[in-house]
């Protein structure tokens, strides 16, 4: 347990340039508190002490803003940066050396029982606001862009962006747009621009029908 905690603290220093001291990390990093609380909750969950496990999970959620179901299986050195709004579902599994930013959801797609949440491999980065949904596999060494919605499994050494998520880089070779948060697809903006073009055509007499969408 102590080795696990030391490894988690080391991961914070490796991933966050704002971390200045061990005391600061231990006392002020909500992501660390959520992960350590989950270790206790998960142990109780495996002992079928479900109420106690959920109670610890809820208390942790209240203080950290991070919701991790006690049934979730989490590997070593998980770093949750900022953390507010992160949700990790019951049947989710997370490998080692994973970094998750605020607003990320690792959730299901419906009310089905059984395995319904994603499996996350090792060395994965999931950027702010991304949603990874359903019983899918995110293999190792994957980057998922901010606000992406991933609904299908992703092979190793890939970069995924967009809604729905699509691969833009695989095995170091670019297959689409670069992994740059400034240039992620914005479906709402694209729809507005489409409507503006349709309205302009209507004004110019190119479209006669009143229904332009």
UniProtKB/Swiss-Prot annotation:
InterPro entries: Hexapep, LbH_SAT, Ser_AcTrfase_N_sf, Ser_O-AcTrfase, Serine_acetyltransferase, Trimer_LpxA-like_sf. Disulfide bonds: none annotated. GO terms for biological process: cysteine biosynthetic process from serine. It is an enzyme of class 2 (transferase). NCBIfam families: cysE, EPS_EpsC. PANTHER family: SERINE ACETYLTRANSFERASE. This is Serine acetyltransferase.
